[in-house]
UniProtKB/Swiss-Prot annotation:
It comes from Synechococcus elongatus (strain ATCC 33912 / PCC 7942 / FACHB-805). Its EC number is 6.1.1.19. A motif ('HIGH' region) lies at residues 126-136. Gene3D superfamilies: Arginyl tRNA synthetase N-terminal domain (3.30.1360.70), HUPs (3.40.50.620), Isoleucyl-tRNA Synthetase, Domain 1 (1.10.730.10). This is Arginine--tRNA ligase. SMART domains: Arg_tRNA_synt_N, DALR_1. It catalyses: tRNA(Arg) + L-arginine + ATP = L-arginyl-tRNA(Arg) + AMP + diphosphate. It comes from the Bacteria. It is found in: Cytoplasm. The keyword Aminoacyl-tRNA synthetase applies. PANTHER family: ARGININE--TRNA LIGASE, CYTOPLASMIC, ARGINYL-TRNA SYNTHETASE. Monomer. The keyword Ligase applies. The lineage of its organism: Bacteria, Bacillati, Cyanobacteriota, Cyanophyceae, Synechococcales. One of its GO terms (cellular component) is cytoplasm.
């Protein structure tokens, strides 16, 4: 079942072809939801945009289009306003018919795409021997939500975790541990991940000031790269330990990922450099092999190259990213690749993509996209830090969110003189705390920095996860109070006599349009905005329309609207990685 906007767009494009010739059939009709209910449900200003090309007044163009629009089953007769705006109001009979289809459709009328794409979403990507911090939060949950939406649409999605599991830092850490704490390199879990981080800092300080230790560390890198057994075993232990810690976070956040770290691409790196050399793209600059690109300059205005092989013959992130991109397009047969990282890497990926383009590695139809995001800031507007000035550990942040949600809940239970089991309290605290953290991030435009505030994200009012969860809980409460099993309600024609009934019905039908936007523009905040507006509209409907005490057929019709709203909220929140609750 196509969403209203999609159906309207198809009819509009047919009218464009009928009005001005088949060459205009692919013209974007510029349809958007109406800014004010008095203008109907949707508006188009395509007549203004075509005036110059067609050499006609916008209003004349609008009149011609309206004459050729076949909308009798979908809309009231379109109205032309002002210089040539075309306003559309959906027919009540159309809304009723669409709602009836949704009642028995588990996917709420959203058909899988055809044909589906093979999509890779590269997200999270923490570094071995380092703890996940608040900076990993955004990549992890933005990437997960994008993957969930694309999967629901029917695309074949490969979720990749490009873990930082290779590099000279391992030689430094292994050398230090062999000297200071050798059992860490032979016994699993001899150290906690936080101990590893502390040892890494000590190793780095030692490396910076001790030339003999520098030499030892470099030798460990050579050992590791050559496959020497002791070095490889030590590296594997460090990776396994970090991986287990990462998985605890992923399990807690319900994140599915397939790890394919930097080391996976090591065998492919020499061919990257050789192929770029063969293609005549490499230039030697101060001993390093580089590709100079258009549009990239340093602060002094000099050309800024992408280095693909260092002067000592070693490789770097750019080499690995080029190898990964070529592997994903070749062996994985990806048609769309999405990289979810902080905005500070935007130039790096722009350079990598341009090199791949110049090398001829990008198929014409391939979509390669960098999805950047801004910083998480404290309430002082600066990068979020602990009081000691350290980076906030992700596990500590999640713990605090759950603790605060638990405190809020127990306070509310006491005020309401309710009695709840410890299991109930814990389940609600986990769902609300973790859901609040996810939603607070996803509800922001990812391109912006945002201020992290526990108080705001856990509030029961406003654009928050608790507000949306409470709307769902309120609907389940209606069912419990009335002894209603929504699944057993007989499908009936909705009765949309009240304005809030119509508004709610129309919003329920818009989920497919919103998901299309999210999949196209990779902006999960649009789904958040939709769910927030749906919750607001439901609460207005709840306040103004009796439900359990209404006469038939309004009673059943309103119960069905409640059920469709709850199902839409549940589905939408699941695509954000947030679980609903029956009570809270």
């Amino acid at each position: 079942m196509a969403a209203p906007l999609a159906q309207l767009r198809d009819r509009f494009q047919a009218a464009l072809a009928a009005s001005f010739g088949p060459e205009w059939a692919a013209t974007d009709p510029l349809l958007v939801p109406a800014t004010n209910p008095k203008f109907g449900d949707y508006q188009s200003n395509v007549a203004m945009s075509l005036a110059k090309q067609l050499g006609q007044p916008p209003r004349a163009i609008a009149e011609t289009l309206v004459q050729n629009l076949n909308l009798a089953d979908l809309c009231e007769p379109p109205a032309i306003a002002g210089p040539g705006f075309i306003n559309f109001t959906l027919q009540p009979s159309y809304l009723v018919a669409q709602l009836q289809q949704l009642q028995t459709d588990e996917r709420l009328g959203i058909q899988p795409v055809s044909p589906p794409q093979r999509v890779i979403v590269d997200f999270s990507s923490p570094n071995i021997a380092k703890e996940m911090h608040v900076g990993h939060l955004r990549s992890t949950i933005i990437g997960d939500s994008i993957a969930r939406v694309l999967e629901f649409q029917g695309h074949e999605v490969l979720r990749l975790n490009h873990v930082g599991d290779w590099g000279t830092q391992f030689g430094m850490l292994i050398a230090f541990l062999q000297e200071q704490y050798p059992q860490a390199l032979s016994q699993p879990d001899a150290l906690d991940i936080s101990d590893l981080v502390a040892f890494y800092k000590q190793a780095k300080a030692r490396f910076d000031e001790d030339p003999s230790f520098q030499e030892t560390a470099r030798q460990r890198v050579v050992d590791l790269q050559s496959g020497e057994a002791t070095a490889r075993q030590a590296w594997q232990l460090l990776c396994d330990q970090s991986r287990r810690e990462f998985q605890k976070i992923y399990d807690r956040l319900d994140i599915q990922l397939e790890e394919r770290g930097e080391s996976f691409y090591n065998p492919y790196l020499p061919a990257i450099v050789e192929d770029l050399r063969r293609l005549g793209l490499l230039v030697e600059d101060q001993g390093a092999q580089c590709v100079f690109l258009e549009g990239f300059q340093n602060k002094e205005g000099q050309p800024l190259p992408l280095i693909v092989q260092k002067s000592d013959g070693g490789y770097n992130y750019a080499t690995t990213d080029l190898a990964a991109l070529r592997y994903r397009l070749g062996q994985d047969q990806a048609q769309r690749i999405i990289y979810v990282t902080d905005s500070g890497q935007a130039n790096h990926f722009a350079q990598v993509f341009q090199v791949a383009q110049r090398a001829g590695w990008l198929p014409a139809a391939a979509q390669i996209e960098h999805v950047p995001f801004g910083l998480v800031q404290g309430e002082d507007g600066k990068k979020l830090k602990t009081r000691a000035g350290d980076t906030v550990r992700l596990r500590d942040l999640l713990d605090e969110a759950v603790d605060r949600a638990r405190t809020d809940l127990t306070t509310r239970i006491a005020a309401e003189e309710r009695s709840e089991t410890p299991e109930f309290i814990e389940a609600v605290a986990q769902a609300v705390g973790l859901g609040a953290v996810k939603y607070a991030d996803l509800s922001q435009n990812r391109n912006s920095n945002y201020i992290f505030s526990f108080d705001k994200m856990l509030a029961l009012q406003g654009n928050t996860a608790p507000y949306l969860l409470y709307a769902y809980v309120r609907i389940q409460g209606i069912a419990r109070k009335g002894g209603i099993d929504f699944a057993q309600l007989d499908p009936v024609a909705a009765v949309l006599t009240e304005p809030t009934e119509r508004s709610l019905a129309k919003q329920v039908l818009q989920l497919g349009e919103v998901l299309d936007e999210v999949a196209r523009d990779l902006l999960p905040n649009r789904l958040c905005s939709y769910l927030f507006e749906l919750s607001q509209t439901f609460n207005q409907f709840y306040d103004r329309c009796p439900i359990l005490n209404a006469e038939e057929p309004q009673r059943t019709s309103r119960l069905l609207l409640c059920d469709l709203t709850a199902r839409t909220l549940k589905l939408g929140l699941s695509l954000l990685g947030i679980s609903v609750l029956e009570r809270m």
